[in-house]
Amino acid sequence: VFYMDNSFPESWKKYIKAGEEEWKDTFERIGFKNAIVAKDFPVNDPEFDPDNVKFSCVRYSPSQVANAMGPSWTDPRTGEILNASVYLYHNLIQLVHDWRFLQTSPADPDARKVILDEDVLGNCIRYVVSHEVGHCLALMHNMSGSAAIPTDSLRSPSFTQTYGTTYSIMDYARNNYIAQPGDKERGVKLTPPKLGLYDYFTIQWLYTPLLDAKSSKDEVPTLSRWITEKSGNPVYRYGKQQISSRLDPSSVEEDLGDDPVKAAGYGIQNLKYELAHLSEWVKDTD
């Protein structure tokens, strides 16, 4: 259970809940129904304390920080997750607005606003919460999530409606800056997926009960076989986040597709379009 802070703006709450519970389906596929449930902070319950490690929460922080985080605390003896909470700082809304505006406004009139409509902003919040819940479930960043996608497939309605912008929500692949003016009308999806194929596989690997195994060592052959079965498929590749040196060009932040030069070309075209139209988009705002 993730308990949702009652300090959140009311308009955010259904999107936060959706982001939390998106991971339900990954667990249902391995036999756990309602493994993740979102609830409001209990009212008039003397046993509830959001600062108690017994309760995993989604907390609101009225801060100028434009970010979110999803830390967890584990038992070092077993790896059991004892507590996993998501923290959303208020200025997160500025961050997701800027992503949505800069990355998709050429293709999406709904993004050409100083203040995004509730559903557009809400779905940005949903994406962030889902990403942070992934961290709570022990998934690290996978910066190769989009590297297996042919760049031009990100302008395909059928492909993007199925897969979004990346094969893993744990990637830093935000919105579809490959899409060009007119692509939304053709059906191209401009936002990240709910969850990707990599995410489903990782939950399977981490949490599937291997009932015949009598010890953790007995699980190794099955877990190794699952990895071997996927090892030749770049869709399931894990790309470690590179903190200092960027030695692997297929595992970097904020990129899209398998061809960074072509992707950058599309992105630059969009930036030029924005510069040419920015004044008319914001002329009626303060």
Give, region by region, the residue ranges found by the protein language model.
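Fold-level signature of zinc-dependent metallopeptidase catalytic domains
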Residues: 1-45, 49, 88
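Active-site-adjacent "gating/activation" loops or surface patches in catalytic cores
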Residues: 1, 58-67, 71-115
